[in-house]
């Protein structure tokens, strides 16, 4: 017969002991279990699908009821039982139309699955020496896009804290966007400092300031952040990808485009939801765009992106003055065509009222 180890004997003895003979620990209150059974809905068994157990799969029963107005001003998870007496928190965005997009849960899952690591996944050893003017142009664009990513991160962080917990799908997705932005800042800085160049000059930041100062509401910020600036950045990244000088740049721009596409999908979907669920929202968007188009026109005319992109497209300063600038102007035209099409989709016709400086890009 095998002999029990000392530890096994101790466990057995403890298990066989009568719990009534155990002395209570001095100063520790007897635990209460009156919280057990307090629930809005019990017995839920959500099963994983072919893609696993996804965030959107959990919207069943009471847990899937998403009200148009979230009355609770605490951090109570949606579907949990509320507790009386909890002091309110300053959640100023409590209407669904102020932040909602039906795609938020799916975009969250996609963002988690497609995260990438600049430190080890970018093929940095593919970088080769470029002509000085081209390297300077690439580094200037990295500087500019890094500022844009920082602006996106800051405005999201500002509004995310004001969004009610009842719409957690949006809050969770936007958390991934801030991480995307941080990753973009990281990889752009690494590209600028890894091939004999350096960071360029800070931009005037007219549109950045416009985005950061859009304090009327999250929807208003999204108009500037995604409908206007984001649509333009998509065209920039597409142009950079088509003109990448090496595998490292191809990896960077293609992965930034994937991330950016998620951001825009949420932004466009949210604006559509607001336009169809909030009376007068399209009129507000129209006013915002009238103001924003002026800042965008100034930045397109005077910003350093214009000449830097022309140099990249033209393979240098000489080529930038001709074919490079021609290609950049085509990029701006394509951006404006995208922008006007999106405005029509939202029910905001900007064809006739487009800012004259922007309209000139369509007439050339």
Each model region followed by its residue ranges:
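Extended amphipathic alpha-helical segments with heptad-repeat/coiled-coil character used for oligomerization
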Residues: 214-215, 230, 244, 268-290
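Short, charged, amphipathic alpha-helical segments
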Residues: 171-175, 251-254, 283
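Long, hydrophobic, well-ordered secondary-structure blocks that form the structural core
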Residues: 152-214
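All-alpha helical catalytic cores of prenyl diphosphate-utilizing isoprenoid enzymes
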Residues: 191-206, 215-239
């Amino acid at each position: 017969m095998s002999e029990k180890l000392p530890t096994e004997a101790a466990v057995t003895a403890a298990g066989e002991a009568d719990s009534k003979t155990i002395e209570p620990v001095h100063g520790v209150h007897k635990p209460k279990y009156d919280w057990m059974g307090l629930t809005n809905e019990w017995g839920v068994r959500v099963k994983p699908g072919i893609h696993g157990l996804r965030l959107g799969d959990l919207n069943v029963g009471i847990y899937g009821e998403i009200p148009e107005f979230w009355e609770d001003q605490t951090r109570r998870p949606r579907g949990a039982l509320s507790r009386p007496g909890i002091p309110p928190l300053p959640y100023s965005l409590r209407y669904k139309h102020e932040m909602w997009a039906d795609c938020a849960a799916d975009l969250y899952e996609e963002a988690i699955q497609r995260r990438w690591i600049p430190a080890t996944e970018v093929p940095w050893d593919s970088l080769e020496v470029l002509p000085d003017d081209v390297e300077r142009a690439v580094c200037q664009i990295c500087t500019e896009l890094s500022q844009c990513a920082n602006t996106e991160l800051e405005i999201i962080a500002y509004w995310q804290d004001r969004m009610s917990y009842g719409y957690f799908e949006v809050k969770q997705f936007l958390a991934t966007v801030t991480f995307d932005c941080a990753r973009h800042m990281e990889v752009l800085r690494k590209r600028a400092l890894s091939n004999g160049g350096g960071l360029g000059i800070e931009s005037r930041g007219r549109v950045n300031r416009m985005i950061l100062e859009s304090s009327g509401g999250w929807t208003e910020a999204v108009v500037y952040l995604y409908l206007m600036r984001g649509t333009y950045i998509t065209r920039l990244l597409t142009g950079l990808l088509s003109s990448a000088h090496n595998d490292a740049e191809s990896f960077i721009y293609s992965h930034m485009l994937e991330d950016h596409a998620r951001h825009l999908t949420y932004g466009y979907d949210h604006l559509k939801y607001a336009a169809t669920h909030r009376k007068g929202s399209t009129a507000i968007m129209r006013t915002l765009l009238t103001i924003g188009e002026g800042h965008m026109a100034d930045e397109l005319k005077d910003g350093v992106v214009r000449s830097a992109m022309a140099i990249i497209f033209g393979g240098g300063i000489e080529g930038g003055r001709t074919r490079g600038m021609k290609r950049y102007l085509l990029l701006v035209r394509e951006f404006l065509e995208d922008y006007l099409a999106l405005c029509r989709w939202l029910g905001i016709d900007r064809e006739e009222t487009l800012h004259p400086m922007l309209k000139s890009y369509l007439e050339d």
